[in-house]
């Protein structure tokens, strides 16, 4: 744990839940950057670049604000992509694309690549890292895919799926479920510890 206030640089309900489950008290701020303007063919590099951009956008906003507590905080920003059979997948752009994503996971697993950038705003210390987890699925029925898409959450998730809604179709998980959710628990805890010293 840290004695400094925490800021989660994300509006993701899944990242929020990971931090809550870890026992942290924090506030959230949305970076509001154009992630599509940042491109790289390597998933680790891409997620690091986007995480850094999120952190820089929020740092600028915090430094220009009058909130002294924010200026003494530790900020966490992360980004996630899913790699499927060597191809990077971000959030689906259409329902059809989401449907194709979900139908494909029975053939190749979903590999979550998540980068995290943690900043001690007061000292300026920045640390970062990347974690990977692989989720294997069995065939997901068309009826269930329709239900997921209608419900809507999957349209806001890298790779077009949410593990909490798909328990009946999940097989082996290699790595942390928190990585699949978008915020690796062990990595995040270690990075917070590093900037707290």
From Swiss-Prot:
Nucleoside triphosphate pyrophosphatase that hydrolyzes 7-methyl-GTP (m(7)GTP). May have a dual role in cell division arrest and in preventing the incorporation of modified nucleotides into cellular nucleic acids. Belongs to the Maf family. YceF subfamily. Signal peptide: none annotated. Its EC number is 3.6.1.-. It is found in: Cytoplasm. It is an enzyme of class 3 (hydrolase). It catalyses: N(7)-methyl-GTP + H2O = N(7)-methyl-GMP + diphosphate + H(+). The active site is at 79 (proton acceptor). Keywords: Cytoplasm, Hydrolase, Nucleotide metabolism. One of its GO terms (molecular function) is nucleoside triphosphate diphosphatase activity. This is 7-methyl-GTP pyrophosphatase. One of its GO terms (cellular component) is cytoplasm. It holds the Pfam family Maf. It comes from the Eukaryota. GO terms for biological process: nucleotide metabolic process.
């Amino acid at each position: 744990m840290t004695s400094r206030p925490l800021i989660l640089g994300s509006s993701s309900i899944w990242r929020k839940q990971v931090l809550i489950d870890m026992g942290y008290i924090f506030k959230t701020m949305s970076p509001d950057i154009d992630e599509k303007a940042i491109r790289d063919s390597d998933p680790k590099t891409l997620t690091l670049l986007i995480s850094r951009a999120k952190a820089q956008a929020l740092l600028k906003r915090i430094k220009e604000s009058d909130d002294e507590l924010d200026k003494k905080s530790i900020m966490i920003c992360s980004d996630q992509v899913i790699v499927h059979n060597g191809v990077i997948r971000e959030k689906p752009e259409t329902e059809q694309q989401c449907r194709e994503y979900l139908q494909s996971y029975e053939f190749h697993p979903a590999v979550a690549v998540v980068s995290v950038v943690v900043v001690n705003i007061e000292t300026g210390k920045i640390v970062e890292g990347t974690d990977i987890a692989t989720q294997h699925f069995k065939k997901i029925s068309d009826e269930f895919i329709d239900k997921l898409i209608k419900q809507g959450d999957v349209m806001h998730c890298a790779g077009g799926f949410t593990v909490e809604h798909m328990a009946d179709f999940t097989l082996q998980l290699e790595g942390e479920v928190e990585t699949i959710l978008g915020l690796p628990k062990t990595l995040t805890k270690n990075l917070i510890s590093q900037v707290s010293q």
